[in-house]
Amino acid sequence: EEEEWDTVIDTSLKGSYLVAQEMSRRLVAAKQAGSIVNIASILGQRVTSAVSPYCAAKAGLIHFSQAMALELARYQIRVNVLAPGYIETDMNRDFWLTDAGQQMLKRIPQRRLGQTDDLAAPLLLLLSDAGRYLTGSTITVDGGHICNSI
Protein backbone atom coordinates (compact mmCIF):
# COMPACT_ATOMS: atom_id res chain seq x y z
CA GLU A 1 0.00 0.00 0.00
CA GLU A 2 1.18 3.49 -0.83
CA GLU A 3 0.21 4.82 2.60
CA GLU A 4 2.41 2.21 4.32
CA TRP A 5 5.28 3.05 1.96
CA ASP A 6 4.97 6.77 2.73
CA THR A 7 4.80 6.19 6.48
CA VAL A 8 7.89 3.96 6.55
CA ILE A 9 9.94 6.16 4.21
CA ASP A 10 8.93 9.33 6.06
CA THR A 11 9.80 7.85 9.44
CA SER A 12 12.94 5.85 8.68
CA LEU A 13 14.53 7.88 5.89
CA LYS A 14 13.09 11.39 5.73
CA GLY A 15 13.08 11.80 9.52
CA SER A 16 16.75 10.82 9.72
CA TYR A 17 17.53 13.13 6.79
CA LEU A 18 15.87 16.12 8.46
CA VAL A 19 17.61 15.57 11.79
CA ALA A 20 21.03 15.04 10.15
CA GLN A 21 20.60 18.12 7.93
CA GLU A 22 19.74 20.32 10.90
CA MET A 23 22.60 18.92 12.99
CA SER A 24 25.11 19.43 10.19
CA ARG A 25 23.90 23.00 9.55
CA ARG A 26 24.40 23.86 13.21
CA LEU A 27 27.84 22.25 13.39
CA VAL A 28 29.07 23.94 10.20
CA ALA A 29 27.74 27.33 11.34
CA ALA A 30 29.52 26.92 14.69
CA LYS A 31 32.70 25.71 12.92
CA GLN A 32 32.58 22.71 15.22
CA ALA A 33 33.57 19.12 14.47
CA GLY A 34 31.03 16.46 15.28
CA SER A 35 29.57 13.05 14.70
CA ILE A 36 26.22 12.00 13.30
CA VAL A 37 25.11 8.39 13.69
CA ASN A 38 22.09 7.15 11.79
CA ILE A 39 20.39 3.96 12.93
CA ALA A 40 19.66 1.59 10.05
CA SER A 41 19.20 -2.18 10.18
CA ILE A 42 20.66 -5.34 8.74
CA LEU A 43 17.61 -5.19 6.47
CA GLY A 44 19.26 -2.23 4.77
CA GLN A 45 22.14 -4.55 3.85
CA ARG A 46 20.23 -7.76 3.14
CA VAL A 47 16.55 -8.15 2.38
CA THR A 48 13.73 -10.40 3.43
CA SER A 49 10.14 -10.66 2.26
CA ALA A 50 7.08 -8.79 3.53
CA VAL A 51 8.95 -5.63 4.61
CA SER A 52 10.11 -4.09 1.34
CA PRO A 53 9.40 -0.45 2.34
CA TYR A 54 11.48 -0.92 5.50
CA CYS A 55 14.34 -2.56 3.57
CA ALA A 56 14.30 0.26 1.01
CA ALA A 57 14.25 2.95 3.70
CA LYS A 58 17.17 1.45 5.63
CA ALA A 59 19.23 0.85 2.47
CA GLY A 60 18.54 4.44 1.47
CA LEU A 61 19.62 5.63 4.91
CA ILE A 62 22.94 3.79 4.59
CA HIS A 63 23.64 5.34 1.18
CA PHE A 64 22.45 8.78 2.29
CA SER A 65 24.84 8.55 5.26
CA GLN A 66 27.76 7.65 3.00
CA ALA A 67 27.02 10.58 0.68
CA MET A 68 26.64 12.93 3.63
CA ALA A 69 29.95 11.66 5.06
CA LEU A 70 31.67 12.74 1.83
CA GLU A 71 29.99 16.14 1.89
CA LEU A 72 30.78 16.88 5.54
CA ALA A 73 34.26 15.37 5.93
CA ARG A 74 35.95 18.68 5.06
CA TYR A 75 34.18 20.22 8.08
CA GLN A 76 35.44 17.43 10.36
CA ILE A 77 31.91 16.12 10.75
CA ARG A 78 31.73 12.35 10.65
CA VAL A 79 28.62 10.49 9.50
CA ASN A 80 28.27 6.79 10.22
CA VAL A 81 25.60 4.14 10.54
CA LEU A 82 24.78 1.60 13.23
CA ALA A 83 22.94 -1.38 11.72
CA PRO A 84 21.43 -3.58 14.42
CA GLY A 85 20.20 -7.07 13.81
CA TYR A 86 17.30 -8.48 15.77
CA ILE A 87 17.21 -6.77 19.15
CA GLU A 88 14.84 -7.94 21.88
CA THR A 89 12.44 -5.23 23.03
CA ASP A 90 9.19 -5.05 24.96
CA MET A 91 7.38 -4.69 21.62
CA ASN A 92 8.72 -7.91 20.09
CA ARG A 93 9.44 -10.11 23.11
CA ASP A 94 6.30 -12.25 22.69
CA PHE A 95 7.05 -12.88 19.00
CA TRP A 96 10.40 -14.48 19.80
CA LEU A 97 8.59 -17.10 21.91
CA THR A 98 6.51 -18.27 18.94
CA ASP A 99 7.53 -21.06 16.56
CA ALA A 100 8.23 -18.49 13.82
CA GLY A 101 10.41 -16.48 16.21
CA GLN A 102 12.31 -19.56 17.30
CA GLN A 103 12.94 -20.50 13.65
CA MET A 104 14.35 -17.03 12.99
CA LEU A 105 16.63 -17.32 16.03
CA LYS A 106 18.15 -20.50 14.57
CA ARG A 107 19.46 -18.45 11.62
CA ILE A 108 21.50 -16.18 13.90
CA PRO A 109 24.95 -17.78 14.35
CA GLN A 110 25.11 -16.78 18.02
CA ARG A 111 21.64 -18.31 18.48
CA ARG A 112 20.42 -15.38 20.55
CA LEU A 113 18.78 -12.00 20.19
CA GLY A 114 20.72 -8.85 20.71
CA GLN A 115 20.00 -6.73 23.74
CA THR A 116 19.85 -2.94 23.68
CA ASP A 117 23.06 -2.92 25.77
CA ASP A 118 24.85 -4.66 22.87
CA LEU A 119 24.51 -1.43 20.89
CA ALA A 120 26.10 0.85 23.50
CA ALA A 121 29.82 0.22 22.85
CA PRO A 122 29.60 0.45 19.03
CA LEU A 123 27.52 3.61 19.34
CA LEU A 124 30.02 5.11 21.76
CA LEU A 125 32.84 4.28 19.32
CA LEU A 126 31.04 6.09 16.50
CA LEU A 127 30.22 9.13 18.62
CA SER A 128 33.50 9.53 20.50
CA ASP A 129 37.05 10.49 19.56
CA ALA A 130 37.87 6.77 19.64
CA GLY A 131 36.21 6.66 16.21
CA ARG A 132 37.68 9.91 14.92
CA TYR A 133 38.89 8.30 11.67
CA LEU A 134 35.60 6.54 10.96
CA THR A 135 33.28 8.23 8.51
CA GLY A 136 30.97 6.75 5.92
CA SER A 137 31.10 3.43 7.77
CA THR A 138 28.39 1.02 8.81
CA ILE A 139 28.87 -1.03 11.95
CA THR A 140 26.67 -4.11 11.97
CA VAL A 141 25.71 -5.52 15.38
CA ASP A 142 23.81 -8.72 14.73
CA GLY A 143 25.41 -11.81 16.25
CA GLY A 144 26.77 -12.77 12.83
CA HIS A 145 23.34 -12.83 11.21
CA ILE A 146 24.42 -10.82 8.16
CA CYS A 147 26.96 -13.56 7.37
CA ASN A 148 24.17 -16.13 7.30
CA SER A 149 20.97 -16.24 5.29
CA ILE A 150 18.31 -13.89 6.59
Q: Over which residues does each language-model region extend?
A:
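A conserved structural motif in NAD(P)-dependent oxidoreductases
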Residues: 108-119
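Substrate-binding pocket helix/loop in short-chain dehydrogenase/reductase
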Residues: 1-9, 104
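Short C-terminal tail/terminal secondary-structure segment
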Residues: 46, 124, 135-150
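Alpha-helical segment proximal to the catalytic Tyr-Lys
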Residues: 25, 70-74, 132
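Residue(s) in the substrate-gating loop at a strand-loop-helix junction
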Residues: 41
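Active-site helix of classical SDR
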Residues: 20, 57, 65
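Active-site loop-to-helix junction immediately N-terminal to the catalytic Tyr of the SDR YXXXK motif
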Residues: 47-55, 67
